[in-house]
């Protein structure tokens, strides 16, 4: 007993339960030290464990000399505790969980076969193999909600704990219904495919028929052409046969057009009428110069209370054309017959001059001088026309004004004449504008602004064409004039600087001065 001195103060403790696993020994040399924190524990009650005393049933220590020791009490406590745990586990167990295989068994490796559990029952540890061997695979019915739990095989003595909500008959009927539905859907697919194939075949047959027909018609047309050319060998000459063929093709085209569009007949007739007209008479075309002239006359003549209007390009063009033709018809009346004669003579002179210049083979310096003299003559004519229109405007405007004095009547014509002749804007500022204070300035301003909006795009076009005309004459000096198109001729006719300079001066002057006074 030298190695194990039982008189030595020793205490065996466990974290979970006293007297069981994980024994720890606290030794102390003195008895005084041992009794400091554990005064209530008696000495020599528990001894060191004997390794031979351990058994698989539990921890049973060798009885000591002191009689009945606490080891027997510990064993009884352990047995009672384990029984209590087992009872609690059975009470808490859900009967539905018996269908689920044991988690510990599922985690075991698959090569382990039947094993003995603590209850003595035989349990198979591989649930996948069990399902493959015992359960037949069936399609899952759509009515069941959630995955189906695997059933656990039980012994004959133990009653079944599983409660199946769906019977086997219902499963069989559901699987049969699914099979029937699958067969029906397959049949429908087959029918759809057959219908599609039939439609495709019909389409191919139709396309082949149309191709055959088109070939036949082409062959017939060739035959007809050959007949037309071959039949009249004795009676008609070759030229006559070709002529006849052309007429036939014309008629055929016309018939095709009539078939394609029912309204094409009228168009065809209109085209024929127009072609006949153009053959007999020359189409009267009003030049761009007349268009400009009519615009200026409208600017001078109109005396309504105009509001400023924004014109788009297409509307402006339409308005221009309408005004041109209306003005032309007005000039042909009895009152303005002399003025119309002057304008028409101007136009004729210019056209004749340009026609001669285009086809002349002489030096261009002579032509250029002639053109300059003609422009001067036309300027004088234009000034006469504009002055006449300004006087008319003055009479109309100042008759409506409140009590116009003689001074106003005397000053205004000179003012208007000067305004139309002046080119420089600085000279315009020096002109007497005393009459503006006695005329309604808002009316004058509205009139000027509206007219400026109408005439501004036209003036920009005129400036561009003037530059083009100048470049044209500079490039062709000393050379023969080429055969220019009618467009360049029309642009040359626009070469009158006094027109748009006078208009810009008047409108800008009225705009600035009236805005200052307002």
Curated annotation (Swiss-Prot):
Compositional bias of kind Low complexity: 113-122
Naturally occurring in which organism (per UniProt): Caenorhabditis elegans
Identification of the protein by name: Uncharacterized protein C04E7.3
Feature: compositional bias, Basic and acidic residues: 86-97, 202-211, 269-279
Region (Disordered): 1-169, 200-232, 252-280
Residue spans of biased composition, Polar residues class: 13-22, 68-85, 123-134, 142-157
